[in-house]
């Protein structure tokens, strides 16, 4: 089934095959089903171009997991979920799941084609940005143990940045991901560490009570600043490519924006699902 969706997406993307070929992703290097003990990806890609494979690769894995779940006995065809929620690029998984449940093969192919366009556009625009690097910094950093308000103040306090910094994902009240250029994120981490050091000094001097600030910052292993204004040009490129391929313009823009430029508020999404009547949540992973 997954291989069929990928093959169908090749046909959808025929009008932009030449553009995708410049990034060597006009045909995905996936072997499905993969031989026992082997991975499905037959060609390694590093740097920003990794997104051109990882975005559709994740969607393929999500669809495969959904199919496995139904074969294991969860009848989502007969007992359709109250709601679907996708974290970050999980919105693509949500849309392809809806298409698969509805038996709409054309829509499933279009959604998978969009995943390929989103990954390719993100990779191309990030590479062209030539953002400065700094040590082990990447394009996204996880920040735990810092409130919404404090993190916003620290981001806004930075004197200057080479590219826009944005709080890309709110995973909890004190767990966030910030997107931006690597050198700017390195400056942000240093600023957070200075604030934490000042807070510790105030506690040690008995000038402040309560729980001390103990932030944990970890660079994510990504080469693209998802959910960032830095990818506004990538969104425009997806719109352009989707129009050439005859993909529904509203669908293309909404899904691409959700992955490329729109911030994620995960607690708000879960609250919305609960308000729709959901009482059980089946976590499809990763790590589930």
Cite the ranges covered by each PLM segment:
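Acyltransferase/transacylase module recognition
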Residues: 1-81, 225, 229-288
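Short, hydrophobic alpha-helix immediately C-terminal to the catalytic nucleophile
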Residues: 63, 94-95
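Alpha-helix C-terminal capping segments
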Residues: 68, 72, 95-100
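Gly/Ala-rich beta-loop-alpha elbow adjacent to hydrolase catalytic centers
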Residues: 82-90, 94
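Glycine-rich beta-strand-to-loop/alpha-helix junction loops that act as flexible
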Residues: 87-89, 181, 284-286
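Alpha/beta catalytic cores of group-transfer enzymes, especially the acyltransferase/condensing modules
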Residues: 96-254, 258-261
